[in-house]
């Protein structure tokens, strides 16, 4: 998912997306540990998606704090 797509979402939608990505990451890690994962690159993709979502959440929080001050 692109950061530009994430910036159009609300904070609540981003938090839900983050929860889903963390669940997917956990599932992929378990599959990797039990050697059931065929596409190992999925682990890195999910990790980068989590980083994107967290970055956009931080941007929104910073913007909200700046507008309040």
UniProtKB/Swiss-Prot annotation:
Name of the encoding gene: rpmC
Protein name: Large ribosomal subunit protein uL29
Cystine pairings recorded for this chain: none
HAMAP family listed in its UniProt record: Ribosomal_uL29 (MF_00374)
Pfam families cross-referenced by the UniProt entry: Ribosomal_L29
GO molecular function: structural constituent of ribosome
Keyword Ribosomal protein: yes
Coiled-coil ranges (or none): none
CDD domains: Ribosomal_L29_HIP
Keywords noted in UniProt: Ribonucleoprotein, Ribosomal protein
Family according to the record: Belongs to the universal ribosomal protein uL29 family.
Cellular component annotations (GO), alphabetically ordered: cytosolic large ribosomal subunit
GO biological process, one term: translation
